[in-house]
Swiss-Prot record:
UniProt keyword terms in alphabetical order: Plasmid, Signal
Name by which UniProt lists this protein: Decorin-binding protein A
Originating species: Borreliella burgdorferi (strain ATCC 35210 / DSM 4680 / CIP 102532 / B31)
Domain of life: Bacteria
Signal peptide from the UniProt entry: 1-29
Keyword set includes Transmembrane helix: no
Primary role: Binds to decorin which may mediate the adherence of B.burgdorferi to collagen fibers in skin and other tissues.
Length: 191
């Protein structure tokens, strides 16, 4: 048996408590890296979209509460931008779902809360891009499901993904109809 004086033991105990506190306060390791990288991919894509928009004369500030698509501009760029953004955002939501599932048994409330915080933060630039009530979708889902549990995070992610898929489909179909007048709703549902 290893002999240990009180001071060493107390220091080891403090260190163990500190490490446990740090772990319980948020995401760590590969999970943190994956989710933060995925969230950054969204902001990078939105920045690229806004840069492209400026070059094409599209004014995102012209968005109104209910007019955030082709009603604001005849230019299909806005529709394309939303399709691009929702594609990247859905990858982020899938990453959240996978990581929450991995941590279902061993994760802490701090880790799940950090996942929710990331989802909420990511919803802001998506909303500024014209995806209506994205932050409300995420926060409303958190009111119905505890964001400090794996199941709560999975339910919030599900609501977020459903919203993204609806927006993606709507904008994709509208874009295809503008490109090809023979493109029907039925064809859209099958794509």
């Amino acid at each position: 048996m290893i002999k240990c004086n009180n001071k060493t033991f107390n220091n080891l105990l403090k260190l163990t408590i500190l490490v446990n506190l740090l772990i319980s306060c948020g995401l760590t390791g590969a999970t943190k890296i994956r989710l933060e990288r995925s969230a950054k991919d969204i902001t990078d894509e939105i920045d690229a979209i806004k840069k492209d928009a400026a070059l094409k004369g599209v004014n995102f500030d012209a968005f109104k509460d209910k007019k955030t698509g082709s009603g604001v501009s005849e230019n299909p760029f806005i529709l394309e931008a939303k399709v691009r953004a929702t594609t990247v955002a859905e990858k982020f939501v899938i990453a959240i779902e996978e990581e929450a599932t991995k941590l279902k048994e061993t994760g802490s409330s701090g880790e799940f809360s950090a996942m929710y915080d990331l989802m909420f933060e990511v919803s802001k630039p998506l909303q500024k891009l014209g995806i209506q009530e994205m932050t409300k979708t995420v926060s409303d889902a958190a009111e119905e499901n505890p964001p400090t549990t794996a199941q709560g995070v999975l339910e919030i992610a599900k609501k977020m993904r459903e919203k993204l898929q609806r927006v993606h489909t709507k904008n994709y179909c509208t874009l295809k109809k503008k490109e090809n007048s023979t493109f029907t709703d039925e064809k859209c549902k099958n794509n």
